[in-house]
Amino acid sequence: MEALKQGADALFILLGGIMVLAMHAGFAFLELGTVRKKNQVNALVKILVDFSVSTVVYFVVGYSVAYGTTFFVGAEQLAAKNGYDLVKFFFLLTFAAAIPAIISGGIAERAKFWPQLIATAVIVGFVYPFFEGIVWNQHFGVQAWIKAVTGDEFHDFAGSVVVHAMGGWIALPAVVLLGARYNRYHKDGQVSAHPPSSIPFLALGSWILIVGWFGFNVMSAQTLDKISGLVAVNSLMAMVGGTLAALVLGKNDPGFVHNGPLAGLVAVCAGSDLMHPFGALVVGAVAGALFVVMFTLTQNKWKIDDVLGVWPLHGICGAWGGIAAGIFGASSLGGLGGVNFTAQLMGTVLGVFWALLGGVLVYGVLKITLGLKMSQEEEYDGADLTVHKISATPDREVSW
């Protein structure tokens, strides 16, 4: 029976890893559909190459930073327990690689290709796993300190703060340091509209992310005996709550409608194993509303050129999710309990601070040394031609 359990657990978390791997296709198509046509190829290449760099760096360094586990041992040892430790790495890698995928959407259309790969390596190798180890592996006694002060540890079941807020708040200084796209904001206060190049591809990306998210959340149990249907239904309710709120506040704009469910899913990650489904519905709806309001403010009033709105979507909604777990996870509101508002607030603030610090340092150093932004001419030509020497839809085919 023990051998059967080991095999089942390995299969369970492997399937979770595959589902979250598929989410990276969602990131790619969401960005492809949002950027202008001259940057579509770049969106696709960035996500795949960022994932590849993340895999190598997380395997060699990042996973060890977070969990103290090294893979510099024989294959016989790695294959023990049906290779469970390896597929657990695969599953958690897909989370780590989401950080540069999130950032990619914010800095789209004008960021240099190679400096961003360096940023990916540093963030996935050190910045992200440092905080991951604090929350999910009890590093440095931070969780014990939060528990001593508040009575409960900081709870983040599937990464509202550890993954999403981390990605969104690292992206904010990256976007600010990079600066806006040329001619995006005019001296007279006018804003040049850059509508999505393909609503169908944007919607496809959203749907791929939505489906994969059930692996992201449910499989965060990491073993089959800990699986919970509550996580699945709470994810569902938060998703539809975010959709409906974005529909109403976004006045039926298809971009908002297809980002609303993602906002809800970002927010529910932390407390999806604790909340009542009605609580998850409210959390998702608040997140959908937050995204619409904050995206509009950042783009139009604050002149922050965050192309996909990754700071509102992942940063703000992720932070809301971390705090919301301490509200709607409470037994007084139908949740399972074992959490409190103060602990959640402390953990969330710590995550936001670390992400901002990491983002400022990584992108600040890169801006000073290598530069972050394409030239005006390169940006005008588009990243597809500038970086990859081909467009998504060439005007003519080569005659063979």
Where are these regions (language model features)?
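Hydrophobic alpha-helical transmembrane bundles of multi-pass membrane proteins
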Residues: M1-W400
